[in-house]
Amino acid sequence: TAIVPETRPVKPKDGTRRWTLADSGLLSLAYVWRDRFNSKKKGEQRYLELRDQVKTQDAAVFKARTINAKPRKYAHRTHASVATQPWRGLLSLGTLATDETLVAIGQSRHLGGGLLVPHDVSKDDFERMIQKEKHSNDK
């Protein structure tokens, strides 16, 4: 199932890296677990802070990529500045959930989409994915 970002991308400032689908995925997790994360900040600074709080729970998004689909099929309403951009990826929920947690994320959850489907990954493959993610974040 596809996920639709809940916000527009955060604009890079002062040499920061650009906002990615993975960042959108982490922010979506913050919105689902909103009782665990909060921020007094506004706008883009809020998005960045919430994303960073989710990262402290060892949550991560891997292999995020857009899909070619009818975008309006996945979101009922978005702000004019938010592109309806369906995407898929592998998410690790870290300490946010157990192996039995059922969760849907993103704008698409309002229409019955965004459901996370379990996908087993070997420990070795998972560790490689973590290393690759760390390496790409260092750039």
Residue ranges and their predicted role:
Residues 1-139:
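RNA-interacting cores
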